[in-house]
Amino acid sequence: MVGWPDRRFLDLIGTDVPIVQAPMAAAAGVELCVGAMKGGALGSLPCALLTPDQLRVQFEQVRSRATGPLNLNFFCHQMPQGADNNAWRALLRPYYDEFGVDPGNGGPLRLPFDPEMCAVVEQLRPEVVSFHFALPEPELLERVKSAGAMVIGNATTVEEARWLAARGVDAIIAQGFEAGGHTGRFLGSDPAEAMGLFALIPQMADAVSVPVIAAGGVGDGRGIAAAMVLGASAVQLGTAYLHSPETPISAAHRARLTEGHTVFTNLMTGGLARGVRGRLVDELGPVRDEAPPYPLASAALAPIRSAAEKAGEYGFGPMWAGQAAPLGQALPAAELTRKLAADALAILEGRG
């Protein structure tokens, strides 16, 4: 065999290599996106925490420094109604007292994709728009498509993949439970039934006709090659890029990546997400019933996190990472992208 076994993603999106740089809020921005694009990957900007003006600025910064397709990523979660924060704030009370902060000074919430952001997409006309936690309402989705964007959805089960395919997405991310950050479950499956990536890829590839993008626990060329053999057309890498200098994570977060101990926790946002352990997880345990639903838990935690980080303590904020974190290589993003692709291709061609 010569070349990539499945070129559908490459032909559809127009990248040099079948790699998507994952859109990691607070861990991926303009610098990482530009570096990944210069290496031939699909660069991504995480937009769920941006205002429309901030998105416009970041988009133009990327466009001025790199060529190639660009992905804008949004969340489509349902905002919970009538949730009670009292038990959560009571659990956090000792930390409010320790850091001398007012529990009423909450932080911003991740808001779902809405008409205002859709108008920005129509103005900017990115090549790709991806969504986490299902898809926006049909009218907004059609507007995104009419703006010329390819649409990528995220699925954690075959059922979710079929749901996305029926609504006309152009490619689907197969997110295994090994992945760092928020699990994108949206059809109510039990977290205890979460699927590993290498069980998920072939089942999803058999179930849908669009390209499948493997995500979760892929940390080097061996993982990329294995995902391709199982039926993936591309891979999405997030944790692998956290070791790159373009990633604006804390020194504490970076140091813990090599330890390899990750857990699912709902303490940071109320939604299950995988990351390395910090002080809050160590002291309260990774999952608490008191935490309100996603994304509400983050607002009550925000003043504690802000005060703690000013004091040099980073254990009260998310330090997302996937299970393959120890495989990371501390290389600039462009160089890392090219190396990972070359290593995978060498294995697939029998040279590695």
Question: What residues fall within each predicted segment?
Answer:
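Conserved active-site-proximal phosphate/metal-binding subdomains
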Residues: 182-187, 191-213, 218-352
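Active-site entrance/lid segments in N-terminal catalytic domains of soluble metabolic enzymes
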Residues: 1-207, 340
